[in-house]
Amino acid sequence: MIHTLETTVAGRKMKVDFGKTGMLSNAAIFMSYGDTVVMINANASKEPREGIDFFPLSVEYEERLYSVGKIPGGFIKREGKPSDKSILHARSIDRPLRPLFPKGYRNDVQIVNTVLSVEQDNLPEILAINGSSLALCLSSIPFTTPVAAVSVGLVDGEFIINPTVAQRENTILDLTVCATKERVMMVEAGGQEIDEETMYSAIMFGFEECKNIVAFQEEAVAKFGKTKNEPVLYKADEEVEKEVKSFAFDMIKEAMYIMDKDERNAQLDKVKEKISEEFSEKYEDKGADISEVIYKTQKEIVRNMLLNEDRRPDGRAFNEVRPISCEVGILPRTHGTGLFTRGLTQVMTVATLGALGDVQILDGIAEEESKRYMHHYNFPSYSVGEVRPLRGPGRREIGHGALAERALEPLIPSEEEFPYTIRLVSEVLSSNGSTSQASVCGSTLALLDAGVPIKRPAAGIAMGLITSEDLEKEKVITDIQGIEDFFGDMDFKVAGTEKGITSIQFDTKIAGLSNSCVKDALEGAKKARLHILGKIKECIPEPRKELSKYAPRTEIICIDPEKIRDVIGAGGKVINKIIADTNVKIEIKEDGKIFVTSNNEPEGVKKAISIIEGLTKEVVQGEIYLGKVTKTTNFGAFVEILPGKEGLVHISKLDFARVEKVEDVVSVGDEILVKVTDIDNQGRINLSRKDAIAKKEEEKDK
């Protein structure tokens, strides 16, 4: 039987159909918002997965190009692997849902979001978060706390829920808020230097709207929800836990209080060896339980240290940033480099400049078709001292790269100001917490070193949180390192300039953040950000005045848009010849702007511009031109005065004296001065050598 529920969000209808699709799924819903439609299916394995120490949740977000009436490009003509945007949307769905599953739940859970129809005014990724939460709540899977999501814009000082395309073009804030009815679960934001107070107000504005969507989900669950399965939760054997903890607690505590990371890890390895020697025979088949007890003991000690003893593992104050060093120009042949070190976290970012034709072409459901500025993030195994095969970028690398990219996007100059494609690559050389925000700092250094005129330098910081079991007691931590991130409750990343915030991403391991925690984290991040920006400015206070000698050079000329066809030529014949002859790259815009780029060949740029100007310049009656004779006849000579533009010098106009034979005065290949005497209705150009000579003589006399 098909059931339907409807509600209104931001003046538009949100509708959910139950029982319409996916009859064999544990839960399947068909959800629409305006003309945007997403199908969500949620399923779980019947038994827990053995031999793992994590919750195997898998979230998929699949865009179908038929949803916007497009056929995929390329030879295959079907959707391939998920796009970067699809991966980012899947991560945005995962983060607010994962903390709300029961602790110790080890069953495989998969949520598949399939985008079926897209109206650009209504974002499918926002609908997918709401639909994923609702599908889980309706299913028999042990997930019982609804999560809602909205997008928030800021136009002319007014907050807008789920802004339309027109509103998104004018907004200075792109914010996604996910929340339960009691607490904020996740925030993603990009903004044009938004101050902390405005950002906090925007988050709270979105939070209030989320409560209405949560109420809608609760109504649906009350009417159509399945009975929940009793979960089988993993828990370490009580006897093992008691004995191991009794034997090792003091040794683990002593190790955890060592401030130096390497020394602490070395001591922990010794403790683990002692535990293994003590219990390997007695609990031969309980290795996983022993590992779980060690982890829980470490976590208990670190959290107590932070929450009750006001002490951090490395001895810093709660609002203190680790020691920072900045360096630029360390690679001789690249266009720009920045090496940023914060404690044991180190990132090297390299900037590369290219022609505008080097933009990334996007083949997705969004209206955006290309990307001129991009940031890629690499996290090799050696950055954490491990050995593993080197593969392509995973979801984490794509997510961290996009986060740092978003932080700097509002600061990148327009293509008119800086006519280059910009690619940044951040190489994580050492990781001990917050490498994504170190990438923001490294990117700023690299851009300044490359001579990119960004509006202002940007920096990023990660804030952490420790809470008591009842969530009543909480402490916000500045610049979390790996151990605080691993055992803590929050990763709150904030990037921006001295003027305001350009990006936020935060998620939690608990059932959401209090309003006061959000405010404290924003304020703490601002103080830390300003401190880091001071260090960056000490290293390189402004963009370099000159580009690297190895960077390409681009010149811009403007022509009449009606003349674009003359530059391109039939089938691209003219422009391809210019490119081949001058070894340049040419990008033509519809408004008549032409960008000419060459790698280390400035003469090629000048030559190409000269040719283009010749092709597009108008012949003016009365003007004198230096032209080349291309053909002679018995009645006159044809002279090319501009590229592709010829005129006729009649035999009577060649000289003051009577001319019997054209070749007596000029030959093919001669360069002569001619004056345009007439352009007839058919565009034919009449020239006079005699008049040109007379005018030049007249100018000499003056």
Swiss-Prot record:
HAMAP family: PNPase. Its EC number is 2.7.7.8. This is Polyribonucleotide nucleotidyltransferase. The gene is pnp. It comes from the Bacteria. It is found in: Cytoplasm. It comes from Clostridium botulinum (strain 657 / Type Ba4). The lineage of its organism: Bacteria, Bacillati, Bacillota, Clostridia, Eubacteriales. Mg(2+) binds at residues 485, 491. Its main location: cytoplasm.
